[in-house]
Amino acid sequence: MSASIPETMKAVVIENGKAVVKQDIPIPELEEGFVLIKTVAVAGNPTDWKHIDFKIGPQGALLGCDAAGQIVKLGPNVDAARFAIGDYIYGVIHGASVRFPSNGAFAEYSAISSETAYKPAREFRLCGKDKLPEGPVKSLEGAVSLPVSLTTAGMILTHSFGLDMTWKPSKAQRDQPILFWGGATAVGQMLIQLAKKLNGFSKIIVVASRKHEKLLKEYGADELFDYHDADVIEQIKKKYNNIPYLVDCVSNTETIQQVYKCAADDLDATVVQLTVLTEKDIKEEDRRQNVSIEGTLLYLIGGNDVPFGTFTLPADPEYKEAAIKFIKFINPKINDGEIHHIPVKVYKNGLDDIPQLLDDIKHGRNSGEKLVAVLK
């Protein structure tokens, strides 16, 4: 069963090292458990431009990982009791994928796994605003800002660090602090909210620009250190010399060194990063036996092997099941207003704005906000 669907569409693809808007792109085929949406809103992520610049995504692959829209077709073995044509959903897509290059969020139609899709409790549409302050999810612009960052944050806290999915327990699950470096990033803001609601740690320490302090403390941060301070690491270590849980929400070769230095002196400590950084990226003289570096790559959510640059990440069924469990747990909390979307800036020219949107992310023109494009 399906609505009227064209044979081709407009989409943003990788072409000669750039994000290029193209016409006459085939509509993606539906694999088992997937639904096809007519895309209404999309959001950008650093991984989008990195797939281009680092040559991870193949030539001609469709870009984009966050999409929201209306279901127009159900694929094989989709639970018809949960999903129907006409429903609005939002979710994660592996854009610029080697395995599935014909599917990406930055397109008029996208395929989303029904197993990992988010679904609003009531139908909502575009609000039409240029900017959205942070708040409960009441529009598609707000909804589409969530999937990649919220699911990543959930996987870090519940899968990497093993927190129970218990909402607002009276006692902290870990009687130790956690540090989020890049607390104002999209993932950082989700981590703070989740860590607070799960009461995961004795203290939530964040590193971010001082201008974001009010919002981040409203989300649940206990203390903020400004990364602009030349002695920020010394400030942190002076007050907290035994932080066993750390997340590098920026995850580049500079920040991983900084976060690593903040790790506990006397306890075993784990630094979680969001790309493929390892101990080899730490200066040899700074490496310590008690500090390990782990990663979380949301692309494993699909349950398949993931070709990623020069290597392939093996399929991780446990990761996929953990993600499905987390989304099932957190979806009602979003619908109840317990989890907020972060500030959103909206681009109004649809897919034509995507090259500029990605350039703005790449060059840091957004600060503490998610960049969203709405399709006409």
Swiss-Prot record:
GO MF term (any one): aldehyde dehydrogenase (NAD+) activity
Family: Belongs to the YCR102c/YLR460c/YNL134c family.
CDD domains: enoyl_reductase_like
Note: Present with 3490 molecules/cell in log phase SD medium.
GO BP terms, alphabetized: response to furfural
Database matches in PANTHER family: HYPOTHETICAL OXIDOREDUCTASE (EUROFUNG), ZINC-TYPE ALCOHOL DEHYDROGENASE-LIKE PROTEIN C2E1P3.01
Record protein name field: Uncharacterized protein YNL134C
Stored SMART domains: PKS_ER
GO cellular component, one term: cytoplasm
SUPFAM superfamilies assigned: GroES-like, NAD(P)-binding Rossmann-fold domains
Pfam family, one: ADH_zinc_N
Organism, as annotated: Saccharomyces cerevisiae (strain ATCC 204508 / S288c)
